[in-house]
Regions:
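N-terminal phosphate-binding caps/lids of nucleotide- and nucleic-acid-binding domains
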Residues: 1-243
Length: 243
């Protein structure tokens, strides 16, 4: 959920496993993480982040309200302003997490001044939700912008349906599914037919272990694979998953 291009509010609600009451305060400590417990874990990362920086950084420049329950008898709610806890209470348990970030950069006006065009910020948020939806088709996503649902998926695993929502039905029909593997890697996804192109490389979506990346080597390899089938300065649409 975003309001006023995400500057007034960014709110994220999920029905996941939640955060325990004891861990909720720790989640906002810099470098605190529940995802690394031994050196071994550094080489077997299965999450989208692990450094313990994001929540600490966000809470230091905004007002944050978080409610979470991990199956306990009561859920816990915290309110933080400028990185400091100003309120702490319990509520009826609803499994999952509800995180609201309001008044971004309220205490650092210089940073607020140098934000990009508000419409660009909103487009960036929309774009990252699209990436998540393509990378995790079995998870349902909804994006609300100023009270209106602008994007929704159902978590049914149908990537074609997601492509049609992001682009359009015609583009989805022109995407070819592929897969291949060896002893070290598995590569699968969708690529467009040579006639379905764009003037920008931004439509080449590459994911490694579920994480969206920009890698010019892989990007150029994809373009080179099309060879002379592509017109000059035209690029394919792709969803490439590498595991």
């Amino acid at each position: 959920i975003i309001k006023e291009f995400g500057i007034q509010q960014i709110r994220i609600i999920d029905n996941g496993s939640g955060i325990s009451n004891d861990d909720l305060v720790r989640a906002f400590l810099r470098h605190a993480t529940s995802k690394i417990s031994a050196d071994y874990d550094l080489f077997h990362i299965e999450t989208l982040g692990f450094r313990g920086e994001a929540l600490a950084s966000i809470s230091s420049v905004s007002k944050v309200t978080i409610k979470s329950c991990a199956g306990e008898a009561q859920g816990k709610m915290l309110v933080l302003e400028g990185g400091k806890v100003v309120s702490e209470e319990y509520y009826a348990p609803i499994k999952g997490t509800d995180l609201s970030v309001e008044n971004l950069f309220y205490n650092t006006p210089a940073r607020l001044k140098y934000l990009r065009n508000p419409h660009t910020e909103q487009a960036n948020i929309t774009n990252i939700i699209h990436k998540f939806a393509l990378s995790y088709p079995n998870v349902a996503f909804e994006l609300h912008v100023d009270g209106k649902i602008t994007f929704k998926t159902y978590g049914d695993g149908d990537v074609h349906k997601i492509l049609s929502k992001i682009y359009n039905m015609g583009v989805a029909r022109n995407m070819i599914e592929f897969s291949g593997s060896n002893d070290d890697y598995k590569v699968f996804g969708y690529i467009s037919v040579p006639e379905e192109t764009r003037a920008s490389k931004n439509y080449i979506n590459i994911f490694i272990n579920g994480r969206y990346i920009k890698n010019y080597g892989i990007q150029n390899a994809i373009i080179d694979a099309y060879g002379t089938l592509l017109m000059i300065n035209r690029y394919p649409l792709c969803v490439i998953n590498i595991e």
